[in-house]
């Protein structure tokens, strides 16, 4: 499938939300980047900046999602090549075609909780935790249509370990692109809240 990427640019439109900090910034942007559908991307290593703030402190938003799979412990050299949203999408596509990730997740639903502490994925009864992604270890989040025609969307997380030596990709399925975009938006707000609270 042919894909054409567009360079992201700073914009004052309602479709772009950017937050700057001393060392990192968050960029949550919506743009037609792939599969002729909307891709929402949250990039915590961006160099963009503007001064929005929102101080919703301890709230946790919950979403029902399915777990597709993960590619863990990518070496630094491999992870560095996965900088943009299209890089992640293409990498996941190839991994699915190679059988490293399934195209369709198992039927079991999980609860994804997003807060200023990060992301927690737990069983639907919330007794068992499947994954925890600390906020400061999340490098990028991308959501996009899965291309299978059922209206489902994939949500991909790129994370690093505490020593920044390895990267991992985590892939979840959302019921719709709107749900996936909502998760990106909540995570952006969580970053915003933490960054705002760090200011003197």
From Swiss-Prot:
SUPFAM superfamilies (alphabetical): PH domain-like (SSF50729)
GO biological process terms on file: activation of protein kinase B activity; biomineral tissue development; blood vessel diameter maintenance; blood vessel endothelial cell proliferation involved in sprouting angiogenesis; cell differentiation; cell migration; cell-matrix adhesion; cellular response to fibroblast growth factor stimulus
Annotated region (Interaction with ITGB1), positions in chain: 139-141
Region (Interaction with KRIT1): 136-139
Positions occupied by motif Nuclear localization signal: 6-7
Residue ranges, annotated region (Disordered): 1-56
Start-end of Basic residues biased regions: 1-10
Tissue: Expressed in endothelial cells and fibroblasts (at protein level). Ubiquitously expressed. Expressed in intestine, colon, testis, ovary, thymus, spleen and prostate.
Keywords noted in UniProt: Angiogenesis, Biomineralization, Cell adhesion, Cell membrane, Cell projection, Cytoplasm, Cytoskeleton, Differentiation, Membrane, Mitogen, Notch signaling pathway, Nucleus, Phosphoprotein, Transcription, Transcription regulation
Superkingdom classification of source: Eukaryota
Gene3D superfamilies cross-referenced by the UniProt entry: 6.20.360.10
Impact when changing residue 139 to A: Abolishes ITGB1 binding
PTM statement from Swiss-Prot or TrEMBL: Phosphorylation at Thr-38 seems to enhance integrin alpha5beta1-mediated cell adhesion. The degree of phosphorylation is regulated by integrin-dependent cell-matrix interaction.
Compartments, record wording: Nucleus; Cytoplasm; Cytoplasm, Cytoskeleton; Cell membrane
UniProt modified residues of type Phosphoserine: 41
Effect in UniProt of substituting residue 138 to A: Abolishes ITGB1 binding
Gene Ontology MF term list: GDP-dissociation inhibitor activity; integrin binding; protein kinase binding
Residues where Phosphothreonine is found: 38
A Pfam family reported for this protein in Swiss-Prot or TrEMBL: ICAP-1_inte_bdg
Ranges of biased composition (kind: Low complexity): 11-29
Protein name: Integrin beta-1-binding protein 1
């Amino acid at each position: 499938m042919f894909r054409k990427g567009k360079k992201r640019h700073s914009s004052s439109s309602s479709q772009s939300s950017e937050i700057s900090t001393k060392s990192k910034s968050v960029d949550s942007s919506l743009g037609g980047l792939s599969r002729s559908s909307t891709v929402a991307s949250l990039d915590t290593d961006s160099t963009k900046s503007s001064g929005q703030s929102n101080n919703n402190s301890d709230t946790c938003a919950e979403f029902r999602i399915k777990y597709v799979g993960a590619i863990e412990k990518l070496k630094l050299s491999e992870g560095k090549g996965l900088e943009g949203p299209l890089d992640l999408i293409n990498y996941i596509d190839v991994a699915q075609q190679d059988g490293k990730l399934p195209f369709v997740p198992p039927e079991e639903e999980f609860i994804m909780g997003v807060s200023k502490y990060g992301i927690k994925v737990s069983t639907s009864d919330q007794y068992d935790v499947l994954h925890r992604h600390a906020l400061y270890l999340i490098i990028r989040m991308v959501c996009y249509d899965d291309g299978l025609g059922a209206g489902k969307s994939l949500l991909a997380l790129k994370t690093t370990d505490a020593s920044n030596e390895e990267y991992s990709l985590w892939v979840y399925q959302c019921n719709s692109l709107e749900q996936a975009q909502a998760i990106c938006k909540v995570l952006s707000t969580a970053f915003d809240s933490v960054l705002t609270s760090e200011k003197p």
